Regions:
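A short LG(V/I)-centered, amphipathic sequence patch enriched
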Residues: 44-64
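N-terminal short secondary-structure element
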Residues: 1-35, 39, 67-69, 80, ...
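Hydrophobic hinge/microswitch elements
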Residues: 133-146, 151-152, 202-263
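Alpha-helical linker/hinge and terminal dimerization helices associated
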Residues: 46-47, 69-91, 297
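A late-sequence structural motif
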Residues: 110, 176, 242, 262-307
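Beta-alpha-beta core module
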Residues: 157-164, 168, 183, 190, ...
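Secondary-structure junction motif
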Residues: 195-217, 286-296, 301-307
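Central regulatory/effector-binding core of bacterial HTH transcription factors
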Residues: 95-158, 219, 228-231
Length: 307
């Protein structure tokens, strides 16, 4: 009878692949380094193959077969987790752990409203949060390292199922002495000669802002090397007279421009918004929970977007 690898051995394997360090992998699995090393050695003996290149010195190097086994281990662990999730969802909806990924242009502005609302509505739900860029979060969702994402679309969601929860309008942020301050609404055409300050590459808000302005990624932004890693930095750059920027209403409602003296104006014309929504893996066992959470988020987002 063939002896199958244990789930714990597969976790050791995946953890080592993700950290490329025995100590950090052991810490991630909450075991000692010797326990993890022994487990992986036993796995190699069971499978009668070399997973690691032992001739690489102190570096962790996987053999080609080892890399293939890592991907198969991820798939197997994801399937096992789905079995547990399906049973949990049937037994008690909206309970237990939920790994939520959120992008930096949403998290700081929505979570202060969202977290208390979720604790009150779903007291047995345990949220584990990770903030990162859209691409990194989608990769983690695909690899089953996250369960649910809170994103802004349009963006590449990697084929995930999605549900919209709110429309987040864009506002133009201007220094108080800017020539456009007197306008009630600002046409997109008026931005053609302006220095439009944007977040750096990797942030979906950058691409969304360019799309609203009808620009391509290579056309504008980062003039003279100016770029920001956060909306708070963008606000300070505009307040210093370096240019103008687009801010989502969610951030403005949370007070991001408070005390800066910046003037905010809506853009004229259609399409000047992003859509906030949830995303999860297709056929996820807890899909019904995620849709229910999306319905709950509609009211929460409406409250957070009030100016």
């Amino acid at each position: 009878m063939t002896i199958l690898p244990s789930p714990q051995q597969l976790r050791y394997l995946v953890a080592l692949a993700e950290t490329r360090h025995f100590g950090r992998a052991a810490q991630a699995c909450t075991v000692t380094q010797s326990t993890l090393s022994a487990g992986l050695l036993a796995l190699e003996r069971q499978l009668d193959c070399h997973i690691l290149d032992r001739g690489a010195g102190r570096h962790v190097v996987f053999t080609p077969l080892g890399l293939e086994l890592v991907e198969r281990a991820r798939t197997a662990l994801s399937t096992l987790e789905a079995v547990t999730e399906a049973a949990m969802a049937a037994r008690e909806p909206m309970a237990g752990p939920l790994r939520l990924g959120v992008i930096p242009t949403i998290g700081p502005f929505l979570l202060p409203t969202l977290m208390p609302a979720l604790r009150e509505a779903f007291p047995r739900l345990r949220l584990y949060l990770r903030e990162d860029t859209t691409a990194n979060l989608v990769d983690r969702l695909t690899a089953s390292r996250l369960d649910l994402l809170l994103l802004a679309t349009p963006c590449d969601c990697g084929g995930a199922d999605t549900v919209p929860v709110a429309r987040d309008m864009f506002l133009i942020a201007l220094p108080p002495s800017h020539r456009l301050v007197g306008e009630e609404q600002i046409p997109v055409s008026a931005l053609a000669t302006e220095r439009l300050l944007l977040l750096e590459d990797g942030h979906c808000l950058r691409d969304q802002a360019l799309a609203v302005c009808g620009l391509l990624a290579g056309d504008r932004g980062d003039q003279d090397g100016f770029a920001a890693t956060s909306l708070h930095t963008l606000v300070q750059m505009v307040a210093s007279g370096l240019g103008i920027t687009l801010l989502p209403r969610l951030a403005v409602a949370a007070g991001i421009t408070k005390g800066t003296g910046l003037v905010l104006r809506p853009l004229a014309g259609p399409g000047a918004w992003r859509t906030l929504g949830l995303a999860w893996r297709p056929n996820a066992p807890r899909s019904a929970d995620y849709r229910a959470l999306g319905t709950h988020l509609v009211d929460t987002c409406r409250e957070a977007l009030e100016l």
